[in-house]
Each structure stands twice: as structure tokens, then as C-alpha cells.
């Protein structure tokens, strides 16, 4: 039978999931949650954190809380302006919520410690290497993880710790985070993370492709604007000659005198032809 944790001060979390082996700041604002933190500080600093199913619920019952949470140890507590309490906690282990035994003056719960399931060592080692390789690719593309964070992930040898560290760093929604917390099989957890990393890499490739297309389109538009401005300046220098064909010829003579590359020269010459045709269409009949 798994070890029971009875009478643990409990903080329902909104908008986040805490994993074992992770050190994280929590900003606590609700009165009952602050009292739970204070109670834990007065005892052994052990606290249970469980994510709410619906962030909009202000006074959750046991039915409003996820089945799986995390047992944490408070490392530091600070009181901030506005009645907020900021705690630095370190995740210890996964816990399954058995019951909320009290909601006043703060939440108290009974929990069962839940151990991760380690399968075939060879399979786990393969997953560990794959996750670290994929994570390295993603971190290089995303630029959202510090060098220290990347190094820490790359140095991990425990596949369970690796899964929790990478899950914490990935840009995923809380439903997916909770799903990873509740998955006890380390192999399946790592497999899920590989899938998420592959998807993030595909999204990154697509974003880069879109950005390149936009940049090329903007560069083309800027170049065309530059060429038209060149023609306008040449035209202004020549003055209005009246005859579109003569004017186009004079523009070409002026163009030859400019020190331009062959590509730019060809583009401007095409614009002169287009410009000449426009003048022919718009010139008044004699």
C-alpha cells in the first residue's frame, strides 16, 4: 500500500500545475490558501497543491479539484503588497487526492503518495536520449529557455526527473500539463513529451516559413517602390516632354548614364516601358 499523507494543508491552484522535482514560485491571494501556507510554515512546511478543474470557481469543493496533485515543501515565504503571499516551493512527489476533510479556516486533505512506474531500462534510456535531443532542437528554435535551463535538462540521467523538467518548460495548456502529471508510466510520459516536442518543432518550421514569405514580399514591395521612385526622379529631371515614346526614349538614355547593376537596369527598363504604355493610354487625343 502506498504511503498516506493525512491532514495536509492544501492550496487549490488556478491556471497552473506543479510537478515533482521542480522549484517554482506561487503567488497566493485567497484567504484560505494563505492560511494553509501559514499553517504549513508553523509545522513541517509540507503543503499539498492541487489544480482546479475550473479556474472560475472561487470556493472549490473536492469535486472541483483534479485527482492528482503534488506534495511540496515550502522553501521561502514572502508577503507582498496587496495581501499577496509569494512562496517558493519544491515539488516532492505525486499524490492522489483521497478526501478534503476540512475547508475552514483552510483546506485540509488526505492523500496517497503515488510512485512513477519504471518499465524496461533500455526503452527508458532510448526515450531519455530522444527527449533530450528533441528538447535541444526546440530550445534552440524557441529561445524561451535560459542556457542554464537547457544545460540542466541535458545533464539529467533520471528519465522521470527529465520528463517532469521538460513538461514544466513546454508551452502547453493546463489540461495537457495535468495529463502529464497524472500519467504514472514514465515511458508513456516521455512518449507524450516526444509528441509535443515534434509538434512544437513543426509549428516553429511553419512560423519560420511564413516569416520568410512575409519578409520576401516586403522586400519585393520595397524594391519595386525604389525602382518607381528612380523613374519618377529621372522623369522630373527630364521634365514633361509630352510625347510618351520620346519621353521613354529619353528616360532610357538617362538610365544608361546611371551606374546601376544589370539586374536593376533591366527592372527599371521594364518599368519605363510600363510607364510609357500608361502615358499612351492616358494622353489626350489630338
Label the predicted regions.
Residues 1-151:
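Positively charged
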Residues 23, 64, 152, 156, ...:
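Short, charged/polar micro-motifs that form catalytic or ligand-binding hotspots
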Residues 148-153, 161-163:
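Short amphipathic alpha-helical interface segments
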Residues 157-283:
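Extended, charged alpha-helical coiled-coil/arm scaffolds that mediate oligomerization and mechanical coupling
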Amino acid at each position: 500500500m502506498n504511503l498516506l499523507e493525512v491532514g495536509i494543508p492544501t492550496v487549490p491552484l488556478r491556471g497552473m500545475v506543479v510537478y515533482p522535482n521542480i522549484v517554482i514560485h506561487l503567488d497566493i491571494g485567497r484567504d484560505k490558501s494563505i492560511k494553509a501556507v501559514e499553517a504549513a510554515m508553523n509545522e513541517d512546511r509540507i503543503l499539498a497543491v492541487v489544480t482546479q478543474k475550473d479556474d472560475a470557481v472561487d470556493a472549490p469543493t473536492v469535486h472541483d479539484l483534479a485527482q492528482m496533485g503534488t506534495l511540496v515543501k515550502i522553501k521561502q515565504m514572502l508577503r507582498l503588497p496587496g495581501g499577496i503571499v509569494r512562496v517558493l516551493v519544491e515539488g516532492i512527489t505525486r499524490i492522489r487526492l483521497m478526501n478534503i476533510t476540512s475547508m475552514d479556516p483552510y483546506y485540509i486533505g488526505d492523500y496517497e503518495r503515488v510512485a512513477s512506474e519504471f518499465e524496461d531500462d533500455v526503452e527508458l534510456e532510448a526515450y531519455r536520449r530522444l527527449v533530450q535531443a528533441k528538447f535541444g532542437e526546440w530550445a534552440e528554435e524557441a529561445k524561451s529557455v535560459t542556457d542554464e535551463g537547457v544545460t540542466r535538462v541535458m545533464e539529467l540521467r533520471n528519465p522521470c526527473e527529465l520528463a517532469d523538467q521538460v513538461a514544466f518548460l513546454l508551452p502547453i495548456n493546463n489540461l495537457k500539463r495535468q495529463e502529464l502529471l497524472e500519467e504514472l508510466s514514465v515511458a508513456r510520459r516521455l512518449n507524450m513529451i516526444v509528441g509535443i516536442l515534434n509538434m512544437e518543432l513543426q509549428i516553429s518550421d511553419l512560423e519560420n516559413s511564413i516569416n520568410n514569405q512575409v519578409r520576401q514580399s516586403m522586400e519585393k514591395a520595397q524594391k519595386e517602390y525604389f525602382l518607381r521612385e528612380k523613374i519618377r526622379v529621372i522623369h522630373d529631371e527630364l521634365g514633361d516632354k509630352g510625347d510618351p515614346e520620346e519621353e521613354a526614349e529619353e528616360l532610357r538614355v538617362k538610365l544608361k548614364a546611371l551606374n546601376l547593376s544589370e539586374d536593376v537596369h533591366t527592372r527599371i527598363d521594364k518599368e519605363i516601358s510600363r510607364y510609357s504604355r500608361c502615358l499612351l493610354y492616358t494622353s489626350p487625343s489630338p
